[in-house]
């Protein structure tokens, strides 16, 4: 039940060794994203948020079998094309287009993974609930970090059983408040 309390759990994630990002690839991607990022790098939609989304997502993926590579990339890309921290209804679409560009240059995701990632990024702010488990895991990873903007995640707006687990929900919320 609460495997994620001590660390990101190991589980049955759907990915191969070829899909995993190594540290060098992760740093390269983050530097590319940083060079064009328009907001405060340490702000509410910046790298601290991405780190928490990554942790939340990988914790759930290792339990529910979502593709870890897609979940990790989602964390780094979903807010990468925001023009400001307020309402920016098109940032998901811009980030999905950016994701497709990056796949040609850096990401090298397989077609199914790229389709999942682009869909998750494009629709992450739309309030949807129904999708592939990988997409749902991405959305929940982001929603679990709402405390940073003064909101409490609502259980009925979470897609996965893992995100609705009271232990993870509380842990993620407390982490989100620390900014």
Q: Model regions: which residues?
A:
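Short coil-to-beta-strand
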Residues: 25-29, 66-73
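Short, Lys/Arg-enriched N-terminal segments with co-localized hydrophobic residues
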Residues: 9-20
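An active-site-proximal "capping" alpha-helix that borders the catalytic cofactor pocket
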Residues: 53-54, 90-105
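Membrane-interface starts of transmembrane alpha-helices
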Residues: 110-115
